[in-house]
């Protein structure tokens, strides 16, 4: 089996990476950064996101594993003390694949420029590059509202525990193939109104954000943020692709939520 290990880059994570590579050396495991079947992320959810995007073109052939060397993460759920056990389990191939939905973002520009597509594990956000943020929200070709505010966030089910949660969005179980739109400081008064609630869309829905005045936007996809100019439309939909995780034990989603945000 081919595998690779990525590290956060701190001393603890780097040392654990070297120890695991040495451990895999005792088994029929091949280290391969080009075409790995298993990608192990050591660090936190940020490190995991980087690993995901590094291999997003090969998602169908890869299963991911996260080891946290800091706080418990939603993607990094193994502890460093369990690394030896994980090496043995992987060498035996004793795992199941669990799949989570992803978000597809398409940015369309003015005449002459090719559209851009992005894949998000957590979320995509849209904000103005400087002036007022005003867009028409169109759902399945039906004009829904004209939004005015700081911006909008579209998240995956697993991503609802991230930025979406801080915006007051609902938490969604990753088995639900859907996406959730939340507002950032919307303007609501006698003149301007928005729905004022998070919206959840099933996988066959397409949400289009269409600029009203300003066509320059700061668009983020997970940890990547880029200034896009002359934007004509931003389209969101549940991607046909999925991310796969190697699971060796039961660790329910709601247990992760409890341990991360409540923990008695």
From Swiss-Prot:
Key word Cell membrane present: no
Taxon lineage: Bacteria, Bacillati, Bacillota, Bacilli, Bacillales
Known catalytic reactions: NAD(+) + ATP = ADP + NADP(+) + H(+)
Subcellular location: Cytoplasm
One GO location term (cellular component): cytoplasm
Source organism: Listeria innocua serovar 6a (strain ATCC BAA-680 / CLIP 11262)
Protein name (Swiss-Prot/TrEMBL): NAD kinase 1
Family designation: Belongs to the NAD kinase family.
Active site positions, chain numbering: 45 (proton acceptor)
Function noted in UniProt: Involved in the regulation of the intracellular balance of NAD and NADP, and is a key enzyme in the biosynthesis of NADP. Catalyzes specifically the phosphorylation on 2'-hydroxyl of the adenosine moiety of NAD to yield NADP.
Binding site for NAD(+): 45-46, 122-123, 148, 150, 161-166, 185
Biological process terms in GO annotation: NAD metabolic process; NADP biosynthetic process
A single MF term (Gene Ontology): ATP binding
NCBIfam families in the cross-refs: PRK04885.1 (NF003424)
A Pfam family matched in the record: NAD_kinase_C
Cofactor dependence: a divalent metal cation
